[in-house]
């Protein structure tokens, strides 16, 4: 409910100036506190916060956005398969212009994901179409020791340093 101060209202915002008896009553009767939804050592993404609020033990079960994306599009993961969220992004020159590939439609994205599957997919690597810019990459026997930067966290940055990087030699493949 952020707003700018209005000079004619004594430099108050509209909410500060408004008569708000019901909100005032709620504030008097209510309690507040701090809910920490991101466990120490975890990236503060929505998937982490939501899983935490739902009671999941993140150190035991969290594997990134990939398994959530798989479940959301009906892809059953088998033991030994690694699921990774596969975002379509928009790059202009060397810069990550936006994380949503210019708000690409699911139909347009499906053409690109099917192309990736045709050119790069095999018995070990599979691409699955999701919704709009959010898709899925499944790798059999994939090593999870990777450094992945969520594109929505780094708009307008050079994209090459943000590419997925292996943290151990075994994750190079």
Where are the regions that the model predicts?
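Glycine-rich, mobile lid/loop segments that gate access to catalytic sites or pores
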Residues: 89, 100-173
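Active-site nucleophile/metal-coordination loop of metallo-enzymes that catalyze phosphate/sulfate
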Residues: 2-125, 132
């Amino acid at each position: 409910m952020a707003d700018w101060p209005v000079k004619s209202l004594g430099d108050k915002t509209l909410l500060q100036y408004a008569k708000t008896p019901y909100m005032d009553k709620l504030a008097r009767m209510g309690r507040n506190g701090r809910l920490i939804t991101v466990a120490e050592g975890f990236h503060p993404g929505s998937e982490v916060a939501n899983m935490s609020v739902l009671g999941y033990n993140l150190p035991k079960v969290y594997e990134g956005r990939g398994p959530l994306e798989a479940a959301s599009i009906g892809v059953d993961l088998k033991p030994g398969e690694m699921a990774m969220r596969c975002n379509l992004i928009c790059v202009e020159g060397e810069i990550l212009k936006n994380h949503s590939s210019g708000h690409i439609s699911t139909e347009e994205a499906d053409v690109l994901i099917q192309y990736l599957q045709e050119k790069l997919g095999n018995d070990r690597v599979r691409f699955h179409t999701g919704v709009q810019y959010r898709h899925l990459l499944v790798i059999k026997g994939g090593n999870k020791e990777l450094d992945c930067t969520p594109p929505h966290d780094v708009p307008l940055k050079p994209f090459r340093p943000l590419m997925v990087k292996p943290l151990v030699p075994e994750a190079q493949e």
